[in-house]
Every structure is written in structure tokens, then in C-alpha cells.
């Protein structure tokens, strides 16, 4: 369901009506909402869905490094997750393009922090961005130390909401990602993590 059109055209009402009809009539259907205006939270709560508030101060957390064995639709999950971590690091560092050395270091550290999780058939507790930063700090290259310093705000600092273990139900059949309070600093990162969380869910 795509909610688009001119203001006042009844988009939200129509979307809510359709969502309600789907949830009540199709037990196999799942609905995932990205809600920038907090329009759908009351309906989702009323239908016993999961509302996930995404912000720097929220008690809801999505681990940016969550990954299941089906991530990426059958390809090597760690390789595909490494591509996501590269994109995420570009945003964490300030939206600048990463150099070849930086990319190699990030790819190496990503493979390293997922090694035991992968060997355990993607069961148990996945790593977090804090684990990823600790792995960066173990590397000898000065570029690794620079990356670790650049992402510290988002792993151990005040914007570390995506560096913690997931504490919400991302498998509910009705999910609303409430991004109204996502500040300017976290917005591009938050959208990346939300979309990756959805990918992790649907593949």
C-alpha cells in the first residue's frame, strides 16, 4: 500500500481501511508501515500490532547488525550484509565515499564479527555495532582507528540506538516503524537500518 497524493485527499483513511480489511480477512498477510507522521500508530496498537518508535531517546532498539540465514534471498548473507555495513559506515562517517583501504578494513571486520554467529547457523545472539567497533580497534591500520573514532558517537555515544540488541518484535504480522522523532543526525542512518530490518524480515 503506497500512501501518496495531495493533502486532504483521504489517503490515510483509505490506507487504514484497506489495512484493517487485510488483517481481518487474510491470516497469511503481513503489513509493514513506515510512518513519518505518526498517523498509523493508534490503529496498529488497537489491532495488537507492534509500534516501533525510532529515535535517539527511544527505549525501542533495532540492532543494525541483525541477520538471519535467509538474509538476501539465498546468497551468502555475510557478503550481502557487508555491503549494508559499508553503506552504513559511509553515513556514520558523514556521508562521504569510503576509500579502498577503508572498504577492505570494514569488510574484514564484518566477516570477523559474524564468524561465530555464522558457524552457529545464525542462531543465538548476533553481533552489534559495538562489537564491530571493538573489532576495528584491534586492527593495526591507522585507517581502522580513524573509522572506529568516527563511528563512536553511534556505537558508544548519545546516538547509539542502533548499536544495541533488538528489543522489539520485528516478526509481528502488523508492524509500524514510527520515525516522527528521528532527528536530522539519525535520519539517513535510521532509514537505512529500518529498510534493512524489513529486508531481513521478508527474505
Model-derived features: positions:
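P-loop NTPase motor domains
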Residues: 1, 38-50, 54-58, 63-203
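Glycine-rich phosphate-binding loop of nucleotide-binding enzymes
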Residues: 1-55
Amino acid at each position: 500500500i503506497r500512501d501518496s497524493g495531495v493533502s486532504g485527499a483521504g489517503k490515510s483513511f483509505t490506507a487504514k481501511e484497506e489495512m484493517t480489511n487485510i488483517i481481518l480477512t487474510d491470516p497469511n498477510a503481513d503489513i509493514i508501515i513506515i510512518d513519518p507522521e505518526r498517523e498509523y500508530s493508534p490503529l496498529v496498537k488497537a489491532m495488537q500490532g507492534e509500534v516501533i518508535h525510532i529515535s535517539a531517546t527511544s527505549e525501542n532498539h533495532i540492532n543494525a547488525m541483525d541477520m538471519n540465514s535467509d538474509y538476501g534471498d539465498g546468497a551468502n548473507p555475510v557478503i550481502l550484509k557487508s555491503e549494508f555495513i559499508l553503506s552504513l559506515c559511509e553515513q556514520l562517517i558523514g556521508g562521504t565515499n569510503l576509500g579502498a583501504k577503508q572498504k577492505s578494513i570494514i569488510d574484514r571486520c564484518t566477516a570477523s564479527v559474524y564468524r561465530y554467529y555464522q558457524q552457529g547457523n545464525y542462531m543465538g545472539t548476533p553481533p552489534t555495532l559495538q562489537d564491530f567497533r571493538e573489532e576495528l580497534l584491534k586492527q593495526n591500520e591507522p585507517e581502522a582507528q580513524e573509522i572506529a573514532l568516527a563511528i563512536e558517537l553511534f556505537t558508544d555515544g548519545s546516538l547509539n540506538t542502533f548499536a544495541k540488541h533488538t528489543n522489539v518484535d520485528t516478526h509481528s504480522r502488523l508492524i509500524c516503524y514510527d520515525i516522527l522523532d528521528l532527528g536530522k543526525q539519525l535520519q539517513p542512518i535510521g532509514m537505512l537500518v529500518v529498510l534493512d530490518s524489513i529486508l531481513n524480515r521478508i527474505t
